[in-house]
Swiss-Prot record:
Domain of life according to the entry: Eukaryota
GO molecular function: ion channel regulator activity; toxin activity
Tissue specificity remark: Expressed by the venom duct.
Pfam families (alphabetical): Chi-conotoxin (PF16981)
Propeptide positions: 16-41
Main location: secreted
Signal sequence range: 1-15
UniProt remark on domains: The cysteine framework is V (CC-CC).
Subcellular localization: Secreted
InterPro entries per record: T-conotoxin
PTM comment: Contains 2 disulfide bonds that can be either 'C1-C3, C2-C4' or 'C1-C4, C2-C3', since these disulfide connectivities have been observed for conotoxins with cysteine framework V (for examples, see AC P0DQQ7 and AC P81755).
GO terms under cellular component: extracellular region
Protein name per the record: Conotoxin Vc5.3
């Protein structure tokens, strides 16, 4: 009976805030590579139009 009361009063999985499963380091790596790609495109397009795709 006590176990049932404890189980019923415990917070459910739905009550917890949702978080991403992706580790922070992976997020940083993705952000860094995206920024590098954008910077390369900006610098390249000023010089050579063929790399702007």
């Amino acid at each position: 009976v006590i176990l049932l009361l404890l189980t019923a009063s415990a917070p459910s999985v739905d009550a917890r805030p949702k978080t991403e499963d992706v580790p922070l380091s992976s997020f940083r790596d993705n952000t860094k590579s995206t920024l590098q790609r954008l910077l390369k495109r900006v610098n390249c397009c000023g010089i050579d139009e063929s790399c702007c795709s």
